[in-house]
Amino acid sequence: MQFTLAAAAALFGASALAAPASPGSTGAPPDPNMYENIDIADFNVRKGEDGTIKYVNFKLSGDDADGLLCEAQNPGLPSNVITCGESKYRFALSSGKQYEFALSLYHELGLAVGFYGTGEIFTHCRAGGLGDFICQQQNPTTIVIDSLPDAPAEA
């Protein structure tokens, strides 16, 4: 019995040691100068009965912004890239895969240099009057933006 337990422990221990590390894992923490965490709060979309987006707004907080208002009237879906106020932050609204809406965020850091990333926003939609629907963010959301190329699309 002791031999069986020892053999099993050795076998499972060896297989755990032989397991490959996750791709791209070097063990070192990521360089904080190579990415930015963007917190999204108070995300709201007003859409018509036909699904057209009439208005989108949210607050963005990142390295160079705290509660920056981002908004657009009749942005379309997907939207063009829209500047948040007079800042170097921009966004585009699109359809998500898991949730109804996704945000692509951009932070211009210099001439043709910046961070970019996309994340989905979990919303709940309800009647908003005059045949419209109001969709509001349900959970705190952080989108990580960086200068790395996007991962290949899944087949």
Curated annotation (Swiss-Prot):
Residues of the AA1-like domain: 33-148
Gene Ontology CC annotations of this record: extracellular region
Compartments reported by the entry: Secreted
TM stretches of this protein: none
Domain of life (superkingdom): Eukaryota
Keywords: Disulfide bond, Hypersensitive response elicitation, Secreted, Signal
InterPro entries to which the protein is assigned, alphabetical: AltA1
Role of this protein: Effector protein. Elicits a hypersensitive response (HR) in tobacco plants (N.tabacum) and cotton (G.hirsutum). Boosts systemic acquired resistance (SAR) to tobacco mosaic virus (TMV) infection in N.tabacum and to V.dhaliae infection in primed cotton seedlings.
UniProt name for this protein: Effector protein PevD1
Chain's gene name: PevD1
